[in-house]
């Protein structure tokens, strides 16, 4: 309780008024028996307190209640006792839907395919098999049965060959020489046989040991013409092979039966 005074005409006479602060105030004032003005004012102001004052009193009371609880916790910590912590939250139950799912199967390894011409990355492709050997240039021209001819490139006589021209001309030259040499060897063998035809196995063995046929191909610039003539003659011969004038069939290395 706080006490205020106001001066009057007489310096020794004071009129006091009081204001209610809260219970257990720091101002401990005791009214005297001769202070009738103070008693009247106190009786007049003993009604209910305003709402704002009640809210402030409740707030102070709640703050005062929190402070002793905090002080008690500090005392327990200083004494070495532990304050019980709040109970931990219960463990989360696993979902039955997750446990019922089957395990995921492992992914299949990627299948490597051979790289094509249009693909840019062919380093990781697996080789399917060994590459097929290519036929030499000119082999198709010989197998076709058409007349043999050297390559027409280049146009000028002194220009160097480039690319597959060298391999093509080599194949044509070897085929032409083989055709001419085979025809000469056939004619020489027929001449040796007809000069002294063997009549027994003994004479045949003697002729085989003494026969020496040498073939010389020197056609020059007419090599391709001679080879093409041989090809034309072979096309006109009968298709029957191994037939003789006597009608007996003989295989290579096999002698005719008597």
Curated annotation (Swiss-Prot):
Motif placement: Nuclear export signal: 204-216
GO-annotated biological processes: symbiont-mediated perturbation of host chromatin organization
Disordered, as annotated region: 66-143, 234-258
Positions occupied by motif Nuclear localization signal: 131-134
Location within or outside the cell: Virion tegument; Host cytoplasm; Host nucleus; Host Golgi apparatus
Biased segments, Basic and acidic residues type: 249-258
Coarse class of the protein's main subcellular location: virion
Protein name: Tegument protein VP22
Subunit note: Interacts with gE (via C-terminus); this interaction is necessary for the recruitment of VP22 to the Golgi and its packaging into virions. Interacts with gM (via C-terminus). Interacts with VP16; this interaction allows the formation of a tripartite complex composed of VP16, VP22 and UL41/VHS. Interacts with the capsid-binding protein UL16. Interacts with host CGAS.
Function summary: Tegument protein that plays different roles during the time course of infection. Participates in both the accumulation of viral mRNAs and viral protein translation at late time of infection. Modulates the RNase activity of the virion host shutoff protein UL41 probably to ensure necessary levels of key cellular mRNAs and proteins. Plays a role in microtubule reorganization that occurs after viral infection by stabilizing microtubule network.
Sequence ranges of Low complexity compositional bias: 77-118
Superkingdom, taxonomy of origin: Viruses
Post-translational modification: Highly phosphorylated in the host cell. Packaging is selective for underphosphorylated forms.
A Pfam family per the record: Herpes_UL49_2
Cross-referenced InterPro entries: Herpes_UL49
Swiss-Prot/TrEMBL keywords: Host cytoplasm, Host Golgi apparatus, Host nucleus, Phosphoprotein, Virion, Virion tegument
MF terms (GO), sorted A to Z: histone binding
Protein family membership: Belongs to the alphaherpesvirinae VP22 tegument protein family.
